[in-house]
Structures are given as C-alpha cells and as structure tokens.
Amino acid sequence: MPKINILNQQGDLVSEKVLATTVFDIKPNQQVLYDVVNAQRAAMRQGTHATKTRALVAGGGKKPWRQKGTGRARHGSIRSPLWRGGGVTFGPSPRNYSVKVNQKVRILALKSALSLQVQNNQLVVLDNINLATHKTKDFQQMLQKLNITSKSLIVVTQMTEQLALASRNLSYITLETASHASVYQILNCKQLVLTADAVNYFEEVLK
C-alpha cells in the first residue's frame, strides 16, 4: 500500500498517510483514460459554429433571368452556392459534441489518473489550506515553500472565497473542488495537490 507524506502550509512534515490501494495504486488503464479525456474535451466545445445554406440566406427568391434566350448560363437563384453572397454547401451547423461515458468507466478513469500521479511522484498532500488574507502574494509564498512552481491542480473539498481570490491571478494554478475535479484536469498538470480531506473524499467515493 502506498504511503504519502502530509505537509503543512510551511512545507513541514506533519504525518504520513497510507493511501487506499483500490483508488491510488491500481494499474492505469490507458484506453479508458484516452476515452474519458476525449469525451471531457469534446464536452468543453461550445458547438455554436454555423453557416447559412441557400435556404437560409436572405433574398434569391426570384429567378435572375429567363431560362432561355439570353445566351447566359441558366440560374434559378442568386443565392446558389455558385454565386458570390450565396449559401454554403455542407457547411458546419450548431451541434452538441458531448459523448456519453458510462459511470463505471468514469470511475475507473479517475482511479487510473490518481494512481498515475502517485506512480510519477507528482502528488502532494496538505493537511489543510487556511489563508489569512485573499492576497495572491501570500498564496504564492505558500506555494514556494511547498516547491510548487509549475502547472498544478489544487483540489479542496470546500472552496473558500479567500482561496479563490488568491489563486485566480496565477496562470499556472488551477483550483477545483474534489466533487468537480475531472480526469483531464488531473492528467493535465505537473503536480497534483490534494488536501487530506480531498484524499478522504476520493477514497470514500471511489472505493
């Protein structure tokens, strides 16, 4: 069973915790990770792209000239895709890109992502995060004491206003609650920072 050091905000060792093998020490399923990350990234797409077909472009109801006798090519509408200002053929239309993923697959992907971070020694566990102020400077000093200087995901169980304000101006920090942390977010960081409560939450929900 994997053990992890629990640190305080000053970077000092407070205690050790034995992580649940069924959550933090499974063999990562690469195919499941691939499928779930693709589904989560697809769900982020707005899908609001749109073009107008010849039926949607204004005008063009009248035949521009008679069928025969002019010497010119026959046309029925000035909004044909052949014309400048005409409709678009087979252009994109608004659609929903989301893909359904079964709950068991999502759970397995989350376990795989957490286990992968543990195996890569990219997991940091804090006993708690309590900020006296909402200043980014104070929060950044705490991160420096913990040697967190690269792209990181910080997962807490309760989002406080002070923590949200202090972290929002740091481009390399993503703050998320344990109930909303996604597989894509966990994999897309150099360091995963969990509070002890967040670890307990994952072990309880994913057991």
Curated annotation (Swiss-Prot):
Tell me the Pfam families matching this sequence. Ribosomal_L4
Q: Which UniProt keywords apply?
A: Ribonucleoprotein, Ribosomal protein, RNA-binding, rRNA-binding
| Region described as Disordered: spans on this chain | 58-78
Q: Which GO terms describe its biological process?
A: translation
Basic residues: compositionally biased ranges: 63-77
InterPro entries, per the entry: Ribosomal_uL4 (IPR002136), Ribosomal_uL4-like (IPR013005), Ribosomal_uL4_dom_sf (IPR023574)
Tree of life domain: Bacteria
Q: How does it assemble?
A: Part of the 50S ribosomal subunit.
Which family does the UniProt entry place this protein in?
Belongs to the universal ribosomal protein uL4 family.
Q: What is this protein called?
A: Large ribosomal subunit protein uL4
Please give the organism. Aster yellows witches'-broom phytoplasma (strain AYWB)
Q: Which gene is the coding source of this polypeptide chain?
A: rplD
